[in-house]
Amino acid sequence: MSKIVRVGAVQSEPVWLDLEGSVDKTISLIEKAAADGVNVLGFPEVWIPGYPWSMWTSAVINNSHIIHDYMNNSMRKDSPQMKRIQAAVKEAGMVVVLGYSERDGASLYMAQSFIDPSGEIVHHRRKIKPTHIERTIWGEGQAESLTCVIDSPFGKVGGLNCWEHLQPLLRYYEYSQGVQIHIASWPAEFEMPDPKKIAWLYHETGEASYRASQFFAIEGQAFVLVASQILTEANVERNNLTGNPVTKTPGGGFSMIFGPDGKPLCEPVDAGAEAILTADIDLRDIDKPKAFIDVVGHYARPDLLSLLVNPTVDKHVTTMKK
């Protein structure tokens, strides 16, 4: 296993509600990252076909036409579109954690597929609890989604979606899996809007999401790749976001790469800029903060506090045998 790894975090605008266009752009970004020598690349939450922000700003009845399009442009894990992405990853010889809206039957899930340098999906997970209004669109991941970390030639790579970073027990379970490089997949998150126009909470801002990702690095002593979406004015109407006070354009991005002590390892880019942030990391640097804090080792008290995990995958239908 290589100790020095070049990592990349995507900050980019999706090809909204367009599956084929989304796949084309995904492959383009993989090729661009490969040309820059990236070994591990992280994409935002539901990068394909974009995060439908209008569910937060419009009534369900005023949003139904977008959700119908959204369902038809979500990607199946075993599909020709995914095969194209897998081929691009194989050609690049990297590890990719891809966030997308997964269609399985007639249901959608907020998925992350872990694709290794051979182009194989070596792990697939779904957000275990979509947040608030998200539950009107996406279903929940089951026990297989508790596994967050894979072994790779570039280290142990993990990933969570958005507010899964605010699930302390899930974070702890990922730490116990030995994560070294963590992909923090986020949608676009914006600045605090004018309180005279809307009652909004700080925890739903890019700054708060940035800090939550940084805390993961500090608490888990892992490198963290923060991947986020952006929104430009040209796509406001397409997303049914005209006139709302929350989604300021261009904006939404807050991508960053953190070291295992929480230190930023690259320069930030503007919230509305397209970029692949990169950093060369040394996995041996993890030992430095681990010597101070190992929350699943010497800095734990399992005799007093411990985590109980149910790994059983429930089935919708079980056929009994006589």
Curated annotation (Swiss-Prot):
| EC number annotated for this UniProt entry | 3.5.5.1
Residues at the catalytic site: E45 (proton acceptor), K127, C162 (nucleophile)
- Which EC class heads this enzyme's classification? hydrolase
Transcription in keyword set: no
pH-dependence annotation: Optimum pH is 6.5-8.5.
Q: Which InterPro entries match?
A: C-N_Hydrolase (IPR003010), C-N_Hydrolase_sf (IPR036526), Nitrilase/CN_hydratase_CS (IPR000132), Nitrilases_CHs (IPR044149)
The catalytic activity, as recorded, is: a nitrile + 2 H2O = a carboxylate + NH4(+)
Q: What does this protein do?
A: Nitrilase that hydrolyzes preferentially 4-cyanopyridine.
**Which family, according to the similarity comment?**
Belongs to the carbon-nitrogen hydrolase superfamily. Nitrilase family.
Q: What is this protein called?
A: Nitrilase
Origin species: Talaromyces marneffei (strain ATCC 18224 / CBS 334.59 / QM 7333) (Penicillium marneffei)
